[in-house]
């Protein structure tokens, strides 16, 4: 347990940010999963793809995902979408 006041604050802030990032990652994974399901079923594919790419871009902007990871995931979703058409 930290003794210095600033170190105590850092622990609190890190715990809060970790919780927030966990929630955002979970929502991102759900959005990607819904996009993949939409591609398989063929219903609302463009809407699901748009939502997934938007979520990936936001996650990359907020440093939840690395920008290259977000780009790779978007590319793979686009490839799957084009293959399904």
Curated annotation (Swiss-Prot):
MF (Gene Ontology): small ribosomal subunit rRNA binding; structural constituent of ribosome
Record bears the keyword RNA-binding: yes
GO biological process, one term: translation
GO cellular component terms attached to this protein's record: cytosol; small ribosomal subunit
InterPro entries assigned: Ribosomal_bS20, Ribosomal_bS20_sf
Keywords: Ribonucleoprotein, Ribosomal protein, RNA-binding, rRNA-binding
Protein family membership: Belongs to the bacterial ribosomal protein bS20 family.
Entry function: Binds directly to 16S ribosomal RNA.
Protein's name in the database: Small ribosomal subunit protein bS20
Organism per entry: Ruminiclostridium cellulolyticum (strain ATCC 35319 / DSM 5812 / JCM 6584 / H10) (Clostridium cellulolyticum)
């Amino acid at each position: 347990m930290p003794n210095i006041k600033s170190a105590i604050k850092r622990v609190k802030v890190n715990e809060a940010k970790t919780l927030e990032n966990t929630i955002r990652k979970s929502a991102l994974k759900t959005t990607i999963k819904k996009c993949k399901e939409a591609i398989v079923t063929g219903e609302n594919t463009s809407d699901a793809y748009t939502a997934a790419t938007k979520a990936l871009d936001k996650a990359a902007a907020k440093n939840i995902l690395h920008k290259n990871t977000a780009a790779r995931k978007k590319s793979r979703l686009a490839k799957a979408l084009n293959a399904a058409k």
